[in-house]
Amino acid sequence: MKLFCGVIALACVPAATAGHNVPYPEEKVAEFVVEKLDVNTIPYVMRPKKDKGKKTFSDYGYVTQRADEKEALVEAAPGRRVAVRVLEQAQDGIYVCIDGLGKKASDGRIQRVLLLQWRGPDGLLKGKESSKNFNSCQVIGGLDDVTAGSSY
């Protein structure tokens, strides 16, 4: 019986993980990222104030100023700019450098490496800060309010 359960479990693993191996585009990757990125998943000090029903740059009124294969620049009306640079495409997702100004003037310029993951054509890219280092994208700027807490 234990052998049978083990065989069933091994048979189900590929089906369970199949949804995570969605192919990412090979061309116009930066444009794809700008269109599909859920901006509510980028670091707090860089993202726009959460607004119900809004998730993408275009939902928040950002307009793409420039886009090529590996880099895009989006800008909102009050002069807020965010640069998105594709660093690496890997099996686990797309590594990007997000570069822009913080919410407050005192935040200054902020730059972070994010790992973006996509669940499929109907979903959005979800970002999380990556610990992977890239020489072309050093961590710059303020701390998230969430991570700046006590060390106790």
Report residues per predicted region.
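Sec-dependent signal peptide recognition
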Residues: M1-A9
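N-terminal signal peptide c-region/cleavage motif recognized by signal peptidases
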Residues: C12-A16
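Exposed acidic/polar residues on beta-strands and adjacent loops within beta-sheet cores, strongest
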Residues: A18-Y152
